[in-house]
Amino acid sequence: MMHRLCLLGTLLALLISSPTSAADTPGYKQKHAEMLYTVVLVRPSNGSGSGTVIWSEPDRAGEYHSLILTNHHVVRQAIKIEAAWDPKLGKKVDREKRNLVRAEWHVYNDYSHMVGSKSSRAEIVAYDAKLDLALLRLIDRERRVTPVAYFLPEDEPIYMFDEVTAVGAGLGEPPFATQGNLAFMDKIIEGENYFLSSAPIIFGNSGGALFRYSPERKRYELIGVPSKVSAAGWQAVSHMTWSIPIDTVRDFLRGNCYHPVVKEPLDRELCASWGELKASGK
């Protein structure tokens, strides 16, 4: 009889015990902080895409400059060429106009349940249509944005079969993660280098992030920007996705005088207008 009572007590204890919180599970907090929370939903006037927070530091005046990396094709419709009258030339000339876009973050409870979102306007401060990259800067200068994605260190190799995680706002949904492996390297598409992964993405993931975990540094690092989905006829092949390598991202940032983002001093000889580049903090 006593044995039965003990067994019944054990079963009751199991039934009424509180479930383990996701926050108590090893790795949940790190995955959210270093991957999910660094990726935002980017909303131009039409459509949507993804972006990754790569920098948020103050300048000498104490204003924060927060930068979001995305694809050019995500914000392409916000860049317009309009004819405007030039009084000095006495004629109409084509001038570029860049409309603001919105960046949207999502807030989670217990690392699982979305409880809300927040957004901020952002300006397009740089882009390269050929590389299909663009850089956004938040209008809000009062607050630091955290967390910020880690970059894969320069010259560190990546290999086929490396496990990777793609994070993006597919179909305009809040950013979510998919897993896969690096599958093919050094694919030239429209003259630029891409690599293939099997982490599924879909329309709206463009401009997001592809991460790989570093056992050495014990952190998730940005290795590429998911940009293209393979297709067979009109059918998207979502598990064959092409990403822009992080080395191309570095070249893009350097070429637009954002050297501090890649942990380098500003090249003042190359960037004659370095004093106007607020994001340098110099």
What positions do the PLM features span?
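Active-site-proximal beta-strands of protease catalytic cores
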Residues: T38-V39, H65-N71, P157-L171, S197, ...
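Conserved hydrophobic positions within beta-strands
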Residues: G51-V53, A122-I124, L182
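N-terminal activation segment of mature serine protease catalytic domains
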Residues: A22-E63, L67-N71, A78-K80, D132-L133, ...
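Conserved active-site neighborhood of the chymotrypsin/trypsin-like protease fold
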Residues: S48, A61-A84, N99-M160, V164-V167, ...
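Bacterial N-terminal signal peptides
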Residues: C6-S17
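C-terminal cap/linker of serine protease catalytic domains
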Residues: D24-Q30, I79-D110, L222-K282
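Short, solvent-exposed loop/turn segments that connect beta-strands within catalytic domains
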Residues: E57-H65, S112-V115, I189-G191, S214-E221, ...
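Positively charged n-region of N-terminal signal peptides that target proteins for export
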Residues: M1-L5
